From Swiss-Prot:
Pfam families: DUF2552. InterPro entries: Uncharacterised_YqkC. It comes from Bacillus subtilis (strain 168). It comes from the Bacteria. This is Uncharacterized protein YqkC.
Length: 79
């Protein structure tokens, strides 16, 4: 699990996003610096459920990875 979390963090930092499966459910961790119709500027990391498009916002990638570590125990693939 720790190797997958490390790979997720490294990929997200290098490409500004990473997708992964948790119990065969797709998620994406992505950095949002500018987004939305009005180009809202933010410096946050979003964890997005790719089935419902619900997101959780984190101020740092480390907080996002820690939340994933504590709440997702079935990560099978880092894409």
């Amino acid at each position: 699990m720790e190797q997958k979390l490390k790979a997720m963090k490294n990929t997200a930092q290098n490409k500004t996003w990473v997708s992964f499966l948790n119990q065969n459910h797709p998620y994406t961790l992505l950095h949002w610096s500018i987004g939305g119709a009005e180009s809202i500027k933010k410096d946050v990391w979003l964890l997005q459920d790719e089935m419902t498009f619900e997101t959780q916002e984190f101020t740092t990638i480390d907080l996002a990875i820690e939340w994933i570590r504590e709440n997702m125990d079935g990560i099978t693939d880092v894409l």
